């Protein structure tokens, strides 16, 4: 009986598929037979007179080059701010992440995310700091016992 369960399941699936396809064919309407009425083919276009106020507003926007964010931009900015703060809380500062990636005992799976974070942090500014720091001047040479004594 247990051996027949997969066979019964496949048969039910095939039966259901054929039933659905038969219903689609029976109720389907071919596109060439359908004719649209004249009222659905025409579209309405409303025209608005352009006034001098509109022209002044357009010129003012052209000269000031102000780009005000739309609603979608505001939501995108809020989301990116949330993710930015989340990543900095999760991984810490950029130099901490670089040290953890270079460490030999670090987890390889987490290092993948740390490397992605490093690429992202190289483009973005820290959300809580006013200035960004250049890490190229702070590179530390590896310890060499021969030259250090």
Swiss-Prot record:
Ranges annotated as spanning the membrane: none
A GO cellular-component term linked to this record: host cell membrane
UniProt keyword Transmembrane present: no
Alphabetized UniProt keyword annotations: Host membrane, Membrane, Secreted, Signal, Virulence
UniProt KW Signal keyword: yes
Segments carrying motif RxLR-dEER: 57-79
Protein's cellular compartments: Secreted; Host membrane
Domain notes: The RxLR-dEER motif acts to carry the protein into the host cell cytoplasm through binding to cell surface phosphatidylinositol-3-phosphate.
Entry's family note: Belongs to the RxLR effector family.
Protein name from the UniProt record: Secreted RxLR effector protein 47
Organism: Plasmopara viticola (Downy mildew of grapevine)
